[in-house]
Amino acid sequence: MISNNSNFGYDKYHRKKPIKEFDLNQTMYSLVTSESKDDLVLKATGFMGNDMSYNDLIISADKLAQAFHNIVIKDGENVAILTISMPIVQQSLLSLSKIGATMSWIDLRSKPKDVIRYINSSNCKTIIVFEDMLPLIESIIDETDVKKVVVSSPKDYLSPIVKVLATLKDKKDGKKIVLPDDSRFVRFNDFIKNVDTNNLITPVSFEKDRPSLIVQSSGSTGKPKQIVHTEYNFNSAVQKMAYTDLPFYKGNTMHISIPPFIIYGLGNSIYASMAFTMKAEMNPFVDENTVYNDLGKFDISLAAPLHYRYMYKQLIELNKSITELEKDNSLEAKKELKRKMKELKRVLTGIDRAKVFVSGGDKIGADELIEMQQTFNKVIVNGYGNNECLGATIVSPMYANKPGSIGVPMEGIEVKVVNPETEEILPQGEIGELYISSDNLFVEYLNNPDETNKIKVIDELEKQWVKSGDLCYIDKDGYIIPRGRNRRLIRKEAFKISPDTIEEVISSIPFVQDCVVVGVDDEKSLSVPMAFIVLKDETLSFDEVKDQIKEKCVEELPDYEVPTYFEQIEKVPYTPNDKQDFRALEELGNSIVRNKAAKKLVKKK
């Protein structure tokens, strides 16, 4: 079986010489300390106005590793981590790598019963927790075997002045974090304060196959699973990044927009920034405005489409507001104009500093991408990946960007497009399921061999492949064009419908902001398309424009692809991992269909 890579010269899209040639056969602790040893004065972290150098980061990680060692955490044991993006993430990665422990990263938005399951399934005896999660951990700890809870606060990393201001704000807001009277709970600073820095443990030796990190899947298409990776996988992932034409240069600043419990945030952002001796500008929030608010602080951002959509919307509204205020000669208008002009200057200066915006986690349509790039006068690089392949696997070349595609395979990545039913490789131009092979595929779904074997397959040449579940085709230049999820295929009578095709047609209508198409159960067919639509202008009457939308679909789509239902929503729902929540829309859609059927029945009676 030959992969599609053999038909395209992908090397031309990669650097001939990588930014950095890493030794992959070492621990993450070893890689970061060896890469930064001659540049310890460089900034490793920016957090809420305070910076930490590589020297200070490594010293603090050594102390944390020793503190873990002192409570008898050994090579191969598991530590659960529930935290926002803040320096404790870097300290945890390095310290737990140093002692050979396995890190289990848990989504902060998980339900209590799921947190219990994640902790117990990975046999964690120690937890590192963001202080706002303390009430949750306190309520469930007796249902686990946890012996120690290390509580970290953003205030641990603030400058003295900002820390005082933050404390005053908490007091005003009535926020008070009190540790329970329980010896299992300890504050981070107390946990490490008595460590003897003159008697630190020796780092463990590297083991290529040792499970080192556990992350959760997004759960957007099924029950969330725990995905096991090795340190080699993380090292291999950053090596592949070094072959892209993106500016992962020593001393540059990377904006950390994605939380650490998502592998795109943990591996491609936080760990990668340390591997390249860059500064990680960490934003502790997960809101859509984080990139916009931090413009001017970074050279490259790895974020999700929703972050760039927010930037685009704010910049358009800012310019529109300034135009209106310039027509008003009142004193209040002049004051507001001055404020708006100051904000515009900040935004434009920040965009000018940024060398590139990288987008992943969800799609950006071709028209939308072009419009945003023209507005920012900056390249937006589309990327694609999944948890099983440790984040980014396919990236658009910065200087050969093709809107509408997700790019080309990164160095060391092989892809093939197959018939989902026969697994036969399809020729260039035909739509099928994307399979991915590389040296950093996941080890397994924890304690779930059946699900592991469903997604991880071995061909006749003993090469491992991961089924992505995504539909795509490869164009004549080797670029990969997404066509939705294989698992989202709508089966209408004898037809298989890809929702992406319908979404592109509807999204091209000027007054449409966003569109998601899902399959819903119908009285006549097993499944039919329902289009959920967000309008740009909230004052528009959806009833008045719905016929125009349907006419557009009738003009451009085969009859069987024209949606049976068109519904308006205020905004598209997203999963905790910033992916469109198809399951929620399917449930909403089926509820709408049932209600329509019930009303028809009542009328007949």
Show where each model-derived region lies.
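AMP-binding/adenylate-forming catalytic domain of the ANL superfamily
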Residues: 3, 152, 555-580, 598-604
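Conserved AMP-binding/adenylate-forming
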Residues: 47-52, 65-110, 259, 496
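Conserved AMP-binding A3 loop
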Residues: 53-55, 203, 212-236
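Conserved structural elements of the adenylate-forming
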Residues: 58-64, 193-195, 208, 227-247, ...
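AMP-binding/adenylate-forming catalytic core of the ANL superfamily
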Residues: 110, 438, 443-444, 453, ...
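Conserved AMP-binding/adenylation subdomain of ANL enzymes
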Residues: 235-253, 261-302, 306-338, 342
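Gly/Ser/Thr-rich phosphate-binding loop
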Residues: 299-300, 314-402, 414
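Conserved ATP/PPi-binding loop(s) of AMP-dependent carboxylate-activating enzymes
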Residues: 408-412, 424-457, 497
